[in-house]
Each structure stands twice: as C-alpha cells, then as structure tokens.
A protein has these predicted regions:
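Glycosyltransferase catalytic domains, chiefly GT-A lineage
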Residues: 1-134
Length: 134
C-alpha cells in the first residue's frame, strides 16, 4: 500500500492456481513463470492494446519513451535478440538448432496485445505446449 500511495497508483495482485499449468512441461527453460506471463498477456489484451513486459531484474538506464514510437503492423511483439554467442548457446542448450539466430531475451518484450488477442495466441500456445497439435 505504501508503494502504491508513493507513486499514486494501485497495485492488484492476482493469485493463479499453478494446477492450471500442471499438464504443461516444466524445465529450467520452461517454468511456470513463462506460463503466467502468457496468461497475463491474454488477460490484459481485453483492456489494453500494447504492453511493455519487463522481468523484475531488468534495470532501465534511460527513458522508455522511444518504445512508444514503435508502430505494430502484424507483429506480435518487439523483442531484443541476444548476442551471437548467447544465440548459439541457447539453441544448443534447447537442442533446437533452428533457434540459432532467433533466440531473444524473454525478460524484455513489447507486446502487441491487440494482435495477440485477435490471433487467439494464448490457447494456441497452450495447445501446442501440451502436445495436442502438430
């Protein structure tokens, strides 16, 4: 409450039962945190069109205002690609060679929630992760 008062805002905490994700794969690369993020994108897409997602450990050293200049067309998100060595290591670690060159920092995502919602992306991703589709 004190933090909310200090910044003249409100803080809403949502409690989500992790059993909702019990049938999804988890590993050091796919955690419940990843699934909560996807679910939050779906929920927020009902009321806002874009969202800047930042992990709690991200330090912003400058203004984020330039991000507001990004105009989405058909893109789901704007992401920051990892450097080449991290790209290669991530692809190898995940045993997905085709990820090399496509690996990005999932802790900083500017999401086009309007497109996310229109494409019904959350149910699609959860179905894919559950192995219910090819």
């Amino acid at each position: 409450n004190e933090t909310a008062k200090q910044f003249n805002t409100s803080i809403i905490v949502y409690l989500i039962d992790p059993k909702y994700f019990a049938d999804l794969p988890t590993s050091q690369f796919w955690s419940y945190a990843t699934y909560f993020r996807v679910l939050s994108f779906e929920y927020l897409s009902e009321s806002i069109s874009t969202l800047l997602y930042l992990d709690a450990d991200v330090v912003c050293k400058g203004s984020l205002k330039p991000l507001t200049k990004i105009i989405f067309k058909d893109e789901f998100a704007a992401v920051i690609p990892d450097n080449d060595s991290t790209q290669a290591a991530g692809a190898k670690r995940l045993n997905i060679p085709e990820m090399n060159g496509r690996y990005f920092n999932a802790g900083v995502i500017y999401v086009n929630l309007k497109k996310w919602h229109e494409a019904n992306l959350t149910p699609y991703l959860l179905t894919l992760l559950r192995g219910e589709t090819k």
